[in-house]
Swiss-Prot record:
Alphabetically ordered keywords of this record: Chromosome, Cytoplasm, Cytoskeleton, Nucleus, rRNA processing, Transcription, Transcription regulation
InterPro entries per UniProt: Las1
Annotated function: Required for both pre-rRNA processing and heterochromatic gene silencing.
GO biological process, one term: maturation of 5.8S rRNA
GO molecular function, one term: endonuclease activity
GO cellular component: heterochromatin; Las1 complex; nuclear envelope; nucleus; rixosome complex; spindle pole
Protein name: Pre-rRNA-processing protein las1
Gene from which the chain derives: las1
Subunit field text: Interacts with crb3, gcr3 and eix1.
Family: Belongs to the LAS1 family.
Locations listed in the record: Nucleus; Chromosome; Cytoplasm, Cytoskeleton, Spindle pole
Length: 470
């Protein structure tokens, strides 16, 4: 059996590339971003070795079709000519030259392409509409005679690259856990030691720097197998997470005995936990530009996932609850770490320079938290609502309402029976007064136009041309 070396490692890579150029069943045209992505992947693969002619031709034809510059006509002519020559020249093996039309019939290539190639080479270039139509017909021919047969052929590749990655991740995770265990054991004994002194002053500083460098180096190492969908995005966070050990290192930090206590602990223990791990986080963040953004993003995903497991109809005040479950305790500490990192980044602390948090980001987080009723997002609101005065004023009625809901309790049937009609009226009057206050405040500071509420700025009248100090 003939074996050929190809630039993709797995059939899934080939299928992903095919999906960039062709929709399933060739129905419609893929979006422009997918076409560009396919061209980029082939360009990256070309650095690995020879690209099959049909794959390279597809890339050239697509590039010519999506080009908008003045040279599109010439680009289409060249790509069509190469498409025909690349198919027919390799089978021209006779001692005497065989007409191209005959060779074309042997591979079921319409003679239309041969005639068009002859016109491009020896006559005046055909018009742009003719070339565009020819390029599209060439792509259809390539789908029928190369891409679809290759995609549906039985794969003889028995090597499981996914399993290789999983074994690699297991080994890396064990290594990272050992390094974090070393740090935890030493830091608990030397909890007050300054870890940012010059390296030459203390031996423990040298050991600390060596441990940090080992973690950073490990995080930067590539996975054994990188999917085709992650080619040529070197400066992208998603690329770093999907193709290196960064995701493994970050996940190790979010386990028990690291950023989460080994057993259920009250939230008041957080300052002590922070004192243990903050120097290590700060040092890694200064040496790995993606570490802090990856940790921040993963924390948020974990918090949202845990919050979905809490019954939205039950409001828990964790400060008064006698015993927390493991999941509740973990969720609280993840929320505390997330709020701490966001506060540090929002206030511009130097060690968080790789993590950008704008007012829009802060507002988005607060809005999402306000839509949830779990105790973890309440922690985030309590920590972050005071960071920005403008946002605090904007959301204050919602903050107050949510706080009141958390202070309330779900009553059983017996407790409902004990409530008198007068008590219910008093409670209703209280809410009415609050609603009137909110409406009065809205009337004085907002106006409605075409269904939208606009906040009116409080600006004193002044003569035209006079500078108003804000």
């Amino acid at each position: 059996m003939d074996m050929k070396v190809v630039p993709w490692r797995l059939k899934e890579d080939f299928l992903y590339l095919m999906s960039c150029f062709y929709n399933e069943g060739q129905e419609g045209i893929p979006d422009l971003a997918a076409l560009f992505r396919g061209v980029e992947i082939i360009q990256a693969w070309s650095t690995r070795g020879r690209i099959p002619h049909s794959v390279e031709s597809t890339s050239q034809l697509v590039s010519s079709l999506i080009s908008n510059d003045r040279s599109q006509k010439l680009a289409l002519a060249v790509s069509i000519s190469r498409f025909v020559s690349g198919l027919l020249d390799p089978i021209q093996q006779s001692q005497y030259a065989i007409p191209m039309a005959v060779l074309a019939k042997s591979i079921d290539l319409p003679t239309y392409f041969v005639e068009l190639r002859h016109a491009i080479t020896h006559e005046e270039l055909p018009s742009l509409p003719v070339l565009r139509q020819a390029a599209q017909r060439a792509l259809s021919w390539l789908y029928d005679h190369y891409w679809n047969p290759a995609a549906t052929a039985e794969s003889e590749d028995t090597y499981d690259y996914t399993e290789t990655n999983e074994l690699h991740k297991f080994e890396i995770k064990r290594k990272v856990k050992d390094l974090l265990k070393q740090w935890r054991s030493w830091r608990k004994v030397n909890v007050s030691a300054n870890m940012f002194l010059p390296v030459e002053e203390h031996d423990y500083i040298q050991q600390f720097e060596a441990l940090v460098q080992e973690l950073v180096t490990t995080a930067n190492l590539r996975l054994p197998y990188i999917p085709a969908s992650f080619v040529d995005d070197e400066k992208d966070l998603d690329f770093a997470i999907e193709t290196t050990n960064l995701d493994i290192v970050v996940s190790c930090f979010l386990e028990k005995r690291v950023l989460i206590p080994s057993r259920t602990m009250p939230i008041s223990f957080f300052p002590k936990l922070k004192n243990v791990w903050l120097p290590l986080l700060q040092s890694i963040a200064s040496k790995h530009s993606f570490f802090l953004p990856a940790l921040f993003t993963t924390l948020w995903s974990e918090i949202l996932e845990i919050s979905q497991t809490v019954d939205s109809l039950v409001f828990l005040d964790l400060k008064e609850k006698e015993e927390l479950t493991d999941k509740e305790s973990a969720g609280c500490y993840l929320a505390k770490w997330y709020a701490y990192l966001m506060r540090e980044a929002y206030t511009g602390q130097p060690w968080t320079s790789t993590l950008s948090v704008t007012q829009t980001d802060l507002a988005s987080v607060l809005e999402i938290c306000l839509q949830r009723s779990d105790p973890f997002t309440k922690i985030i609101i309590d920590e972050l609502s005071i960071l920005d005065k403008e946002l605090e004023n904007k959301f204050s009625p919602l903050f107050q309402y949510r706080s009141d809901m958390f202070d309330s309790r779900i009553l059983d049937e017996q407790e409902f029976e004990d409530i008198t009609l007068e008590q219910m009226k008093t409670e209703l009057n209280k809410f009415s007064v609050r609603l009137n206050n909110i409406e009065a405040q809205a009337d004085s500071s907002t106006m409605e136009f075409q269904g939208h509420v606009w906040y009116k700025p409080s600006v004193e009248p002044s003569p035209i041309g006079q500078i108003i100090e804000s």
